[in-house]
């Protein structure tokens, strides 16, 4: 049974890769309504895959209702927006929508982020490209805590849904890291790692 579940997961990952490749090969659309339809279609594909993955799908997809709430609270009209574990880029997409819906200028916000999963990182790049958003997600997929691609960044807005309850997140390699201003996070409290990282920015 376990082998069958692994086989199904592998097939699902291949399907996800096919979806990403499909959108990668689509010529970018400049017109607003058509571009919005393409973006919504891509977002729908991501949500369906996340739903099928269940708990594991949360590593790249945060429910849109949660993202909208975060953005409405922060109101990122202008400045640098950062997500250290950006997944498929939902935080960035919603930030851009917020600016547009309030008659703001999308060029007034700068997008920064990264993700450790190469497929997810590619998904984020495409999710943003479809909507005409030019982000800085680093030149390759990388773990924020072990390989920070934006070490000098000082963000104005930080939104994140970081991975929790990781048993091994590389603490032994980061004991002297400058981000631990308030103390080294215990191995069993991985959420503190994310909190201290955002406070450092």
Stretch-by-stretch model annotation:
Residues 38-39, 89, 118, 198:
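Alpha-helix N-cap/helix-start and coil->helix boundary motif
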Residues 175-185:
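A short, gly/pro- and small-residue-rich
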Residues 11, 44, 118, 177-179:
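N-terminal functional modules and adjacent low-complexity/disordered segments of proteins
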């Amino acid at each position: 049974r376990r082998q069958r579940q692994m086989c199904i997961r592998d097939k699902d990952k291949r399907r996800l890769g096919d979806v990403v490749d499909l959108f990668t090969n689509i010529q970018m659309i400049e017109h607003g309504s058509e571009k919005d339809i393409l973006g919504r279609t891509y977002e729908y594909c991501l949500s369906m895959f996340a739903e099928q993955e269940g708990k594991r799908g949360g590593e790249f997809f945060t429910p849109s209702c949660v993202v909208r709430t975060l953005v409405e609270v922060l109101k990122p009209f202008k400045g640098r927006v950062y997500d250290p574990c950006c997944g498929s880029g939902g935080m960035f997409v919603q930030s851009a929508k917020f600016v547009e819906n309030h008659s703001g200028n999308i060029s007034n916000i700068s997008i920064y982020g990264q993700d450790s999963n190469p497929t997810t990182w590619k998904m984020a790049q495409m999710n943003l490209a479809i909507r005409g958003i030019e982000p800085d997600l680093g030149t390759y997929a990388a773990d924020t805590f072990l390989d920070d691609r934006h070490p000098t960044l000082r963000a104005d807005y930080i939104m994140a849904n970081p991975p929790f309850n990781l048993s091994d997140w590389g603490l032994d390699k980061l004991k002297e890291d400058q981000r631990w201003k308030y103390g080294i996070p215990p191995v069993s409290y991985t959420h503190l790692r994310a909190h201290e990282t955002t406070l450092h920015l």
